[in-house]
Amino acid sequence: NEVLFYFTEDEYKVAAEDTRERLVFLRACDMNAVKRIDQIYLGNGASNDFFYTRTRKKTKFVVVGCTKTFRNCFCVSMGTNKADNYDAAMNIRENEIQLEIRNEDLNVFSGKEIDFDIDYVSKNEFEVDLPEKVDFMYMQNHKMWDEYDTRCIGCGRCNYSCPTCTCFSMQDIHYKENKNMGERRRVWASCQVDGYTNIAGGHSFRVKHGQRMRFKTLHKIHDYKKRFGENMCVGCGRCDDMCPQYISISEAYEKVARAMREKDNEELISEVYEKVVKAMKEKREE
């Protein structure tokens, strides 16, 4: 969480900026996730998020090459096994480290110059069948979500391990010494836990776990894509690793894909049936 500003009875003060620079080492899928987060905080609305912007400007990223896939990764299916929006890249060998420096601020190393291509995986242990398009109204009350009512326990571990989850809530903390003074915090939140969609009057938009799973799943492969042109999920597989109930987001994507194919088949059968009935009717009238 982060403090946004402090307030008194008649004024507020923006929290002091942390001036330290940050160097983040991450994988290609995570670098693609940073791009998604940038879209949310910097390309989503009339203005950039002030607090995210000032932190982002002081952060540099080093992509670590992947020589092999991890068990639950499906980055190849999501098209995120490669990245090019980094400040530096690194390949780790047995007795050496190979570097590519793109940001001159990081050009503090010496060594032999070589041709550099970052390591990346070209095949995961499994492929994910993604839907080409999603009919939200059709999927909204689809029976596939019912199983998650009992399977999901709403712990939120999938969200907290996800590099593209950006939801947050606001908390006003009032000081004991003076109830009219305090601070406003932005706190990372989970759309899967109880209370996230609570509103005044004791109501909640998504009470059942299946409804929350639907929201998360479709946000990753439909809502975000509709706005920004690419899937939000980067296929890192961490949510599958973290889930105590062994719920797989990749399996949820495939269920959506199957449901959409079933819908298309039903529409095709209905269309053919209507044409046959119409042709038979016209023939009788002759």
Residues covered by each model-derived region:
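Ferredoxin-type iron-sulfur electron-transfer modules in oxidoreductases and energy-metabolism complexes
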Residues: L130-T150, F168-E286
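A generic "binding-loop/recognition-motif" signal
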Residues: D30, C158, C239
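Hydrophobic/aromatic-rich, well-ordered segments within soluble, folded domains that form packed cores
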Residues: L26, M31, T164-M170
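Oxyanion-binding "anion nests"
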Residues: C152-P163
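Iron-sulfur-associated redox domains of electron-transfer enzymes in respiratory
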Residues: N1-M137, W145, I269, E274-K275
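Hydrophobic positions within alpha-helical membrane elements
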Residues: N32-A33, S161, M242
